[in-house]
Amino acid sequence: MRNILYVQIIFILIIAFVTPIKSYAFNVAKHISNVNGLTNNSVNCILEDEEHTIWIGTWDGLNAYNGREITTFRYSKNNPNSISNNVIRQIIECKGSLWIATDNGVNRLDKRTRQITRYYLRTDNKVPNQEKSFILGKSAAGDIICLIKGLGFFVYNDSEDEFNPINTDFASHVKDYSVSDSDHVLFLLNNGSSVYLSYNLLVNGGKQDDLRTVGIHTPVDKIFLSKGRFILNKDNRIFLLNPDFTVSQDIELDSNKPVSQAILAEDNMFVSFIEGGCINYDLRKNTFTYLNELSNQLS
């Protein structure tokens, strides 16, 4: 199900990237939509790469914005150097390439040559019948792993240029996951439980008995990773975790709207909502303000 239809994308640079918090008085907003060349106004993911190109994954293709123009990448039946599917779910940068999860396969895009390699990871060649069937992760060393719903976890072997299966016994219970810079893997299970183990243990065949429970006693709906910190969400509650997976802050938001994203920036956390709007939560003062620069149609 689509999270939100964007009428326009607004890049508040201090939120999306690394501009200091003290620059709030000088926010710069850039409006981009399909009028400017974006393939679709419904956006699933955004990534700024090392060259500061903005990559935008939509429901109808991948877009690269360099500050002046938009380059688009879309599936073409007659072009093997096109992406495997136009619904872009996730973008990860690693070693000069972008790894792109779509609704039908994973793609590796060489940023220098623009060569695209497709990895379907399915033997039946059928399009998955559920959304977000491919979920990517990256280890601290730059290893790429992928969860394929119904098939399990896979790790990319660069010398063989293929994904090899990881022998685990709990993949069918995983709804979502994320890998931190310290090589801890947080899993959101189908029953709402949140558990974790080390990346090294996962790729070496970690089992369900190896999973450790996060220090909260309520099921959650979403997990986020920002600035090396895990963030969990259930309804209007946000749980910011410590490195040892205990709860650092339990935040109750003054809104019943479903959360779409949570991003850390110094002592602040920016929280956006699926139905539109965004707040800046001060983690030291435990206060928040609404960002009036953002249209209520954006999340």
Regions found by a protein language model. Give the residues of each.
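Carboxylate-rich, polar loop motifs that coordinate divalent cations or form catalytic acidic clusters
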Residues: 1-299
